[in-house]
């Protein structure tokens, strides 16, 4: 066939998913040609029918690890080698080739998809396009965005997958991995043992159920590769095998085979019901059935998930590179809202978040190599060492401004106060410098309007990741953020508003001329909104005029009014309590522990106590001048109210002294260590150990010994857990409570006489409740 002959056929539709089918390098020209990749695209035409399409692209060597957090370079030959290993293993092998080099696979997945998008020309999955396919080669050459399509709001068609595969894995191998890595997740340890040693139980049953809008199947197997012992529904109602003959570069002809779904392009799985291993067992069975018959090039089958990270990850997801070609989404619950959240994240990021982590939005960018900083920003940053007026803002605030005007605990009243926060602040600055990144800009714009809450962690991850991936861009954003803080501070001061505390993307302060006796809450809020608008204009002017940035009006920074307040109490830069007595709305209390439900309950009571203290002073001071006599009366009543508060709290927690979830804390990374061997006998519980662990402290049999940490979520519900050491959990909480009350007593003491001290030791008095 003459490779120069092209016969195009055009078809309207959209792309639902894209996955690498196979990859290779051109012999003898590795550096020049990069990595050749054959993509399988699951598409839906304008008639609503799913169609398979294939595209060949070349990922240049310099792009392969461009946004890798760990730097360095992996050759195209290495990528081709790992792909070959993932498509040539035994049919019953587990798809765990990425185990041990998951970052390399994430780079491959992200960079290849980014290249595919740029080469073909589509904007995103589910956006309407016109496909141009060469009938001579069978390859998709181009996708032309269809801005005038009648149906421009395509969404995923979801089905539900439920599976149960209680696989037994050699406990000694899991234990060895756990001990060797000093704190690895047990899910990682189990996968490592599974990859090395396989199943220890040859007759592991598998129960699978798939529900789609128009089909239902259920299969029950006594063992994975034996005929089903229970059968319901036809697999042909779910998907069909499709083969295509393709002609690749170099006039090389191959035959490919895919499972083409009939009525879905996403399968959702409830993570509380179906483990990742159960999904993999199901897909492994289908892979063996689909490719047991020779005559075609087998696709890659490789798993990427949080279990592949030795320390686990904060988020749950499921991704396979290659087979099966459709998307598998993890949901927190089977509820419709949870499914909607998962599909929204998938659509807005083409499935790259959270799979590729901090690199996700870099792979969604319209460029390969990141563009340089805008010239004026670069020039200003270069002047920092000589410009001493700005040195502190960039040196002392190297992660963003954190400052307060107070050197000691302070209480404020009589004047209206307000708290402000920039929406999606740091990503907004990035988009102001690089407005061509439309995918990121769309999400940032939605966050400004309080939309796409599910992608807030993605934006936080993106900005934090810049420090590792593009440190010069990160420093520039911090520089601009600090300049904005100075601009806002000056603008606010000119409007009669003094900023008290500024923390990165938000601040609170006091209106110097708005007296709470003369101005109502609605009027104060109007003043706050006017101030926000004035600051927004000043910041926009800074970005456009002084920094020379050119961005659309829709992306201008938004300063949100968090609330207006009549009273404030602050004891440190990050610790404050703000309350509106006129409206009696819930106070804004920050800077106290909240890691457990017990901590959150005490925080709520502390916030209420601070409201009570305010009301006591308002009552005592009414029509009087605040003096040391009134202070002593007030302080005595506050101390008494504090006693009632902690007694009420102890009564509350006493009823929950046997409830692990109430006391449970998330283990900090610095605390992570190897799990005791006693946890290794519950395999089905270990599969869930890929997130930060929840711990409780239980009493030591030795009354003089420290409490023992128990990973209670890794134990079955029938496990007998020793008595919870409630006192150990309460000690830091009560310490914070007592400290803040004493700061409050100091803050209200405007006199030379010593402050009354809250000297109670609540735990010493009530420890008997928890013995």
Curated annotation (Swiss-Prot):
Pfam families, A to Z: Herpes_HEPA
Show the GO MF annotations. Answer: transferase activity
Which GO terms of type biological process are on file?
A: DNA replication; viral genome replication
Q: Name one GO cellular component term.
A: host cell nucleus
Source species, domain of life: Viruses
> Keywords in UniProt for this one?
DNA replication, Host nucleus, Transferase
Q: Does the keyword Transferase apply?
A: yes
Where in the cell is the protein located? Answer: Host nucleus
Where along the sequence do coiled-coil regions lie? none
Q: Which family does it belong to?
A: Belongs to the herpesviridae HEPA family.
**What does the subunit comment say?**
Associates with the primase and the helicase to form the helicase-primase complex. Interacts with the origin-binding protein. Interacts with the polymerase catalytic subunit.
Q: Function of this protein?
A: Component of the helicase/primase complex. Unwinds the DNA at the replication forks and generates single-stranded DNA for both leading and lagging strand synthesis. The primase synthesizes short RNA primers on the lagging strand that the polymerase presumably elongates using dNTPs. The primase-associated factor has no known catalytic activity in the complex and may serve to facilitate the formation of the replisome by directly interacting with the origin-binding protein and the polymerase.
HAMAP family linked to this entry: HSV_HEPA
Put simply, this protein is called DNA helicase/primase complex-associated protein
